[in-house]
Amino acid sequence: MARKCEICNKGVVAGVQYSHSHRQSKRTWAPNIKKVKAIVKGTPKTVHVCTRCLRSGKVQRAI
């Protein structure tokens, strides 16, 4: 599965997670990406889109 939204280019972010005792471990946070059939330039196409773009209506879904 793709790890980047094709609409807003939201991708994986790296950082540090802290435990209760304040020990650090590196980890990544990935966006919630869905594979959706959408209308792109008048034709239906399968694109990888984050759920934020789906909810906000930035993607016109193909039926």
Swiss-Prot record:
Top-rank taxon, per record: Bacteria
Record keyword Membrane present: no
GO biological process, one term: translation
GO molecular-function terms, A-Z: structural constituent of ribosome
Keywords per UniProt: Ribonucleoprotein, Ribosomal protein
GO CC terms: ribonucleoprotein complex; ribosome
Family annotation (Pfam families): Ribosomal_L28 (PF00830)
Family, similarity comment: Belongs to the bacterial ribosomal protein bL28 family.
Protein name: Large ribosomal subunit protein bL28
Gene: rpmB
